[in-house]
């Protein structure tokens, strides 16, 4: 039988008074959960950092030396051309406008094999390392000595949606946990008032496959990514709706004294229930409500960029229309890491449409990639500099990936030199930066025209195994039992790329 509102518990004991309606009790107690959690957050001593959330893995890390403890993942939606960015192929200029040599007929997504096409941007060597980067990314060229470029990536699909799933989960089908979810499951979180895994989608739209790209899959729901908006209200329905007829100076609970009574009463109910019925599912649900309530204070604080200096905001490009959106995401990513978030994922580009809002340069590579690079180049370089200046890059891993590359020949009819490139899953480039890596280097190679990976080929399981290894996680030991199978991010594959580790 429920208790009446007037029966506020004292020291965890209760006494039965007049019954109230179940519907009224449930409505009232739901509001109380939020109030209780906020009260818990506000009651902390000044200067006391939020508590950590431990790993729930059966075989918790570290299994290996810990080189990094947090990750920023920059994902370029649509298929960034390696040939126009990080994989210099001088022979393409020599053979520009000629047919593909040899008798092999490549398999392409749209089935069109035009003439060979040179890159649209000049390549230059940058930094002390002499790393080749094209003029598509002049700002990234200025931080070339921070980059570890992998030029021999391969994927198993040339279709955007399954290829994007594979880049994030290791599998082409949906229903599997993404990298950020596995990391949260394995390492826990360094704060209990923000999620372990935060996603910053492109305001123009979601990536191919939508929100599945930050799904927990079969892992517990608390390990899914939590999407923030980078402008406006960061999260829908984070704050409870307030009735228009609530008098000034009062809350939806009534007077401030009534709200305090509610907090105390619900806290006592929770304690009593956990002592008598310690059910994990219910405790997990209560924890999720509590996290949401804590985020009512932590999210506005971490997303408020007004405390950043004008110089910092300008460096990230917040003062330019072309760079402001992604610049804000990059700056917010750094702030989230500072508050204890483990994994922040930024998507550059939305899904399909016309005009294109991603890196899918089928029709006009020069126009398409120039537009997208302008949005991200300056902010990403600023992020690397900022992390380095703050001493954070030594224990932070930055990933810059895409689902596949582009073909060295034009997407056009035979003997025609078109302006676009088709999808290429046989060879493309990604890069890493941060702690535990050899900087200013490239690993692996595609063939002379950039069509196929031919030297030290890297698969997504290899890439994911290396990321987990840098975090101190043995990818063969991070498992979750599901439907009779011990599942892993890397399935039964994957080798750590030892040659890129410092």
Where are the language model's segments positioned?
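Ligand-binding pockets and gating/stacking loops
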Residues: 3-502
């Amino acid at each position: 039988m429920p208790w009446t509102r007037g029966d506020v518990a004292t020291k965890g004991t209760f006494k039965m008074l007049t019954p109230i309606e179940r519907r009224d009790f449930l409505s009232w107690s739901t509001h109380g959960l939020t109030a209780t959690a906020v009260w818990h957050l506000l009651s902390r001593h000044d200067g006391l950092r939020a508590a950590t959330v431990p790993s729930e893995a059966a075989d918790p890390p570290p299994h290996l030396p810990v080189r990094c403890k947090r990750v920023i993942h920059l994902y370029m939606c649509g298929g960034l051309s390696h040939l126009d960015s990080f994989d210099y192929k001088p022979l393409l200029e020599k053979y520009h406008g000629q047919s593909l040599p040899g008798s092999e007929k490549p398999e392409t997504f749209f089935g069109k094999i035009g003439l060979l096409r040179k890159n649209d941007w000049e390549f230059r060597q940058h930094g002390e390392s002499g790393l080749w980067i094209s003029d598509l990314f002049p700002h990234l060229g200025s931080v070339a000595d921070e980059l570890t470029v992998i030029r021999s990536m391969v994927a198993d699909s040339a279709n955007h949606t399954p290829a994007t799933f594979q880049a994030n989960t290791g599998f082409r089908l949906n229903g599997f946990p993404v990298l950020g979810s596995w990391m949260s499951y394995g390492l826990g979180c360094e704060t209990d008032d923000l999620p372990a895994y935060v996603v910053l989608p492109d305001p123009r739209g979601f990536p191919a496959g939508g929100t599945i790209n930050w799904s927990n899959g079969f892992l517990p729901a608390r390990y899914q990514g939590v999407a923030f908006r980078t402008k406006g209200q960061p999260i829908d329905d984070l704050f409870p709706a307030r009735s228009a007829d609530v008098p000034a100076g009062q809350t939806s609970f009534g007077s401030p004294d009534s709200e305090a009574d509610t907090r105390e009463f619900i806290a006592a109910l929770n304690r009593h229930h956990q002592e008598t019925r310690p059910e994990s599912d219910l405790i997990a649900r209560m924890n999720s409500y509590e996290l949401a309530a804590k985020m009512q204070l932590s999210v506005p604080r971490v997303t408020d960029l007004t405390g950043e200096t004008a110089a910092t905001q300008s460096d990230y490009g917040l003062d330019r229309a072309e760079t402001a959106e992604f610049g804000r995401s990059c700056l917010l990513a750094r702030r989230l890491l500072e508050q204890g978030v483990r994994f922040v994922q930024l998507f550059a580009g939305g899904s399909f449409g016309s005009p294109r809002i991603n890196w899918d340069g089928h029709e006009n590579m020069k126009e398409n990639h120039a537009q997208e690079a302008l949005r991200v180049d300056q902010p990403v370089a600023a992020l690397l500099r900022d992390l380095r200046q703050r001493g954070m890059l030594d224990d932070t891993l930055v990933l810059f990936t895409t689902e596949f590359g582009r073909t060295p020949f034009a997407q056009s009819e035979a003997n025609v030199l078109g302006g676009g490139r088709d999808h290429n899953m046989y060879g493309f480039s990604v890069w890493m930066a941060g702690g535990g890596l050899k900087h200013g280097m490239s690993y692996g190679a595609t063939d002379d025209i950039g069509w196929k990976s031919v030297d030290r080929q890297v698969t997504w399981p290899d890439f994911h195994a290396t990321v987990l290894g840098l975090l101190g996680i043995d990818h063969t030991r991070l498992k979750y039992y599901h439907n009779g199978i011990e599942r892993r991010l890397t399935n039964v594959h994957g080798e750590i790329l030892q040659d890129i580790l410092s």
